[in-house]
């Protein structure tokens, strides 16, 4: 906040939706226009005094954010194509970005491995790490496992779960064996203990494309 990276915004959800609709109808990307960033201290104080509660956005530095993803390879985002992310809601609750980065810093996390749906979040997180003056971890974004029709598994849709395998009598070591090799170019081979599975795991062997899984 003291470095002018965190700033209050007063637009309602309806106002933001109208801005987004207007930009899209004009053929422009729905990027937040930073109108609240330009408010003076007096203007901010008046809005708060009138009862308006701000949400808080993180101002992105205008540059190309690049990292060497351990699965995807070189990934780049131009911040001019990204909206400043909201970090704190009107009620004071935190969105995912800020506590995620703070937790990684406090726990000295060296590698962050997560689904490819978080790739754009990583662009935000790298700048938040930089704002804190912290070391940026290594990142790896894995593709999602799909069924034999190419559809993603979903807990909401009652898809497969670890418990379902357990209830059907599958041994955990068998499932770990399968997960070690699926989506890689390696042939599946039986490994009987967890240490050997860990020793054989290589993140660079994970395919950049979604692997298909059939229970049959």
Language-model features: locations:
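Active-site cores that bind ATP or allylic diphosphates and position pyrophosphate for catalysis
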Residues: 2-141, 146-155, 161-162, 186
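Catalytic adenosine-cofactor/nucleotide-binding cores of aminoacyl-tRNA synthetases and other
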Residues: 120, 132-216
């Amino acid at each position: 906040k003291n470095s002018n990276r965190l700033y209050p915004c007063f637009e309602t959800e309806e106002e933001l939706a109208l801005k987004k609709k207007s930009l899209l109808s004009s053929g422009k990307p729905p990027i937040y226009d930073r109108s609240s960033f330009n408010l003076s201290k007096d203007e901010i104080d008046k809005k708060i005094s009138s009862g308006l509660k701000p949400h808080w956005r993180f101002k992105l530095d205008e540059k190309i954010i690049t990292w060497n993803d351990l699965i995807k390879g070189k990934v780049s985002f131009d911040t001019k194509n990204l909206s400043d992310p909201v970090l704190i809601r009107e009620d004071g609750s935190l969105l995912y970005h800020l506590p995620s980065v703070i937790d990684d810093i406090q726990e000295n996390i060296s590698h962050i491995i997560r689904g490819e749906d978080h790739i754009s979040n990583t662009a935000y997180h790298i700048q938040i790490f930089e704002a804190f003056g912290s070391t940026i971890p290594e990142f790896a974004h894995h593709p999602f496992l799909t069924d034999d029709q190419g559809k993603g598994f979903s807990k909401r849709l009652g898809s497969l779960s670890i418990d379902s395998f357990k209830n059907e009598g599958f041994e955990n070591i068998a499932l770990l064996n399968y997960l070690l090799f699926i989506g890689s170019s390696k042939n599946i081979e039986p490994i009987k203990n967890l240490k050997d599975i860990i020793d054989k795991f290589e993140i660079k062997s994970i395919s950049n494309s979604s692997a298909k899984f059939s229970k049959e």
